Amino acid sequence: MNFLLLVLAALGFLTQVIPASAGGSKCVSNTPGYCRTYCHWGETALFMCNASRKCCVSYSFLPKADLPRLIGNHWQSRRRNTQRKDKKQQTTVTS
């Protein structure tokens, strides 16, 4: 019984001492990432912390790409307008 209590006390102490971030230290102060040898699934490396460790940041912290939505429709509508103008010019020239 005393041995079981000793084991439980040791495990409780170890949970306080061992870091929960898988051994990774924080990157630069403003970066929401951790320095690791390999990035976890769902993370990408932004820069190197040192020669062997990368600053791994979760995809959820990265900015989304800001692309215009109607690029394809815009060019199709412009193409139709030029074809209509060409047809009008052809009819006026031939008559």
Curated annotation (Swiss-Prot):
Q: Which domain of life is it from?
A: Eukaryota
Q: Where is the composition biased (Basic residues)?
A: 76-87
**One Pfam family it belongs to:** Defensin_beta_2
UniProt keyword terms in alphabetical order: Antibiotic, Antimicrobial, Defensin, Disulfide bond, Secreted, Signal
**Residue pairs linked by disulfide bridges in the UniProt entry:** C27-C55, C35-C49, C39-C56
Q: What is its main location?
A: secreted
PANTHER family, per the entry: BETA-DEFENSIN 123, BETA-DEFENSIN 123-RELATED
Which function does this protein serve?
Has antibacterial activity.
Name this protein carries in UniProt = Beta-defensin 132
Q: What taxonomic lineage is listed for the species of origin? A: Eukaryota, Metazoa, Chordata, Craniata, Vertebrata
